[in-house]
Amino acid sequence: MVDILPHPSFLGDMGDHSKKKSGIAMCVGCGSQIHDQYILRVSPDLEWHAACLKCAECSQYLDETCTCFVRDGKTYCKRDYVRLFGIKCAKCNIGFCSSDLVMRARDNVYHMECFRCSVCSRHLLPGDEFSLRDEELLCRADHGLLMERASAGSPISPGNIHSSRPLHIPEPVPVRQPPHRNHVHKQSEKTTRVRTVLNEKQLHTLRTCYNANPRPDALMKEQLVEMTGLSPRVIRVWFQNKRCKDKKKSILMKQLQQQQHNDKTNLQGLTGTPLVAGSPIRHDTTVQGNPVEVQTYQPPWKALSEFALQSDLDQPAFQQLVSFSESGSLGNSSGSDVTSLSSQLPDTPNSMVPSPVET
């Protein structure tokens, strides 16, 4: 908090109490004693000259007309404080406006347009699965490709995925084929097979049987033929493919677990954490730090002047009293004059004692 206080020497007897309380005022900026009429006090106990309290970056003077922040013993205006210490986008390193919608991934904050996969630049929408690896965002497909390369023993980093992606697929170029004999041409031709498409009911029946017994006997296969209406060859091939897929998946999971165990043992594990993108939220512009609150105090002679204008006082005697208060000569040497003047003044009610006015 910054308080604008009149210097005790300008208050005369009225300033004795604050003088005893504050002691000698030393400026934090220049280190010299403050003799000015006003002291800028920064909460809790930092005191400045009015000419010394300014922004450490842009040298803008800080007073009751602006907000300032204190960090590491330095004072900043609001604009420079937000620029230097405010929250910035983890992708473009640019700050946020109060109207910006942001996406959060752990401790990182992103603009809506910056929330993209670092490999394929696909925009990640709410509900999409992604991972955060080396402070870079990866979509689910690129994260899976990265894990496959890790299981194969290749160096894993998001930048290595670019090399495994086809950059351009060339158009087929027609090539003139030399004439072949008829029997050779017939042997090179492959017979076209019809692809069997299973419906949900057939798949559910086959999966239920597979979970109970991955290797059904001949009797079970005959029952499946009657229940699904598929040929024995299709059922046999489906079970073979299913066992092969499960075996590959089991081997891959073991390799991934072994790789993760080795990474943790060697303190080199950088496994991406799978996350799910949430809905964008409005950025909170509240900056960390205590904003400066400014208070101004009205000089006592000004309060007396306003009181005199609203009451029936002897104007010549009162003007003489005000001149003594302004010049700071209302001390022990002029005590007799003050006594004679104060006898001419009416009693001042307690409600008219000047008090600080907050602005």
From Swiss-Prot:
Low complexity biased stretches: 326-336
InterPro entries xref list: HD, Homeobox_CS, Homeodomain-like_sf, ISL1/2-like, ISL1/2-like_LIM1, Znf_LIM
Keyword Aminoacyl-tRNA synthetase (UniProt): no
Chain spans, region Disordered: 171-190, 326-359
Record Gene3D superfamilies: Cysteine Rich Protein, Homeodomain-like
DNA-binding region(s) from the entry: 191-250
Subcellular compartments: Nucleus
Comp. bias (Polar residues): 337-359
UniProt cross-references to Pfam families, sorted A to Z: Homeodomain, LIM
GO cellular component, one term: nucleus
Domain LIM zinc-binding residue range list: 27-80, 30-143
Function as written in the Swiss-Prot or TrEMBL entry: Binds to one of the cis-acting domain of the insulin gene enhancer. May be involved in subtype specialization of primary motoneurons.
PANTHER family for this protein: INSULIN GENE ENHANCER PROTEIN, INSULIN GENE ENHANCER PROTEIN ISL-2
Descriptive protein name: Insulin gene enhancer protein isl-2a
Organism: Danio rerio
Organism phylogeny: Eukaryota, Metazoa, Chordata, Craniata, Vertebrata
Gene: isl2a
